[in-house]
Swiss-Prot record:
Pathway: Amino-acid biosynthesis; L-arginine biosynthesis; L-arginine from L-ornithine and carbamoyl phosphate: step 3/3
Disulphide linkage map: none
Compartments (UniProt record): Cytoplasm
Gene: argH
Major localization listed first in the record, in broad terms: cytoplasm
The family this protein is said to belong to: Belongs to the lyase 1 family. Argininosuccinate lyase subfamily.
GO cellular component assignments: cytosol
Keyword field contains Cell inner membrane: no
GO biological process terms on file: arginine biosynthetic process via ornithine; L-arginine biosynthetic process
Catalysed conversion reaction: 2-(N(omega)-L-arginino)succinate = fumarate + L-arginine
EC identifiers of the protein: 4.3.2.1
InterPro entries reported in the protein's UniProt record: Arg_succ_lyase_C (IPR029419), Argininosuccinate_lyase (IPR009049), Fumarase/histidase_N (IPR024083), Fumarate_lyase_CS (IPR020557), Fumarate_lyase_fam (IPR000362), Fumarate_lyase_N (IPR022761), L-Aspartase-like (IPR008948)
HAMAP family, alphabetized: Arg_succ_lyase
Name of the protein in its database record: Argininosuccinate lyase
Amino acid sequence: MSVEKTNQSWGGRFSEPVDAFVARFTASVDFDKRLYRHDIMGSIAHATMLAKVGVLSDAERDAIVDGLQQIQAEIEAGSFDWRVDLEDVHMNIEARLTDRIGVTGKKLHTGRSRNDQVATDIRLWLRDEIDTILAEITRLQEGLLGLAEAEADTIMPGFTHLQTAQPVTFGHHLLAWFEMLGRDYERLVDCRKRVNRMPLGSAALAGTTYPIQREITCQLLGFDAVGGNSLDGVSDRDFAIEFCAAASLAMMHLSRFSEELVLWTSAQFQFIDLPDRFCTGSSIMPQKKNPDVPELVRGKSGRVFGALTGLLTLMKGQPLAYNKDNQEDKEPLFDAADTLRDSLRAFADMVPAIRPRREIMREAARRGFSTATDLADYLVRKGLPFRDCHEIVGHAVKYGVDSGKDLAEMSLDELRRFSEQIDADVFDVLTLEGSVNARDHIGGTAPNQVRAAVARGRKLLAQR
């Protein structure tokens, strides 16, 4: 009986070749070829282990390792011929290895399946991506600390409901983003622990009959632990989902920060100016200077949220173990990592270059009755119940709205219309400086607390 030879590694069982459209439809090499370095890394470790347990000879191992290293050089030189008919990154590299070193190349896959191979590749790739992203978060946090220290005394309005609430320092406001990014960092560090568990050796789903020593490949590849169950090792992608969840939270924070930057650069706020290199213009309106970087980051957050939803939906209906559905895990994961990394890089470059317009910020804080709470607290210290003080100050604010005067602009006689408990010392608390300086505790907006927080932040970053 004659058997038609195919390029597929699994072609022996089939009596006809795959339909040409189906071959293109099911191929993943166009996007999973970015895993080449990690695929080769895993294969070198696997071959090294096979030689140690006697499945390969030392000469076979050396030929495989040398061949794989030459293939990596070809790929990085741009001379490697990626073939769709070979389906994926794994079979493209294996086929090229066999071309280079002959039948020995066919021995590389002994004791291994593409199921555990790809799971290993993705974990190795994601581990490196997380490390890069963590470095970008740290760089952005360093920029925030530098700007916060420089603007520790700069007063701006703090907002609730986007309405003027209380005076804060610009430095204090920036440190809020530092804190959020710190939690993003912690989540990704924690996620990395679960990413860094090795599925290699799980084979297709049940393990292998060869006398493999998974501890060897685990050590060679820098994993923290060997996966404890072969079914789980090849089939689950919860580590990718967890990464996308952490990435979504980080992008949500960047999106909120972006919204503030867009508002602050507008003619209606004018709180800050962004250098021209982070902005673009209009093809029709000559005056425009558009904050494209924060706008685009705000928009790109949706891509990462979509990746999270896509992966959850991908996994929710799959029985154990591996299913072809899992081919769809890579593009959303790749896109989420790329988007977060690039967004962080853009912000890390941009934030230190922000130029605050201090007088405009200060004037905005002065205009909105931002020290009303300070007046209420002043009356509480005079012995009045807070609810009564709240009502008294509310009447004073209404008078200020009607007369066009801020609380600090009213005379003592005007203020005493609302309470005889108000004395001349009230003006110490109605100034913007008095307001921010009074909030002198850990986490408060007082300038000395901002500087202390910056010092704590720098100590934290130095310990990473």
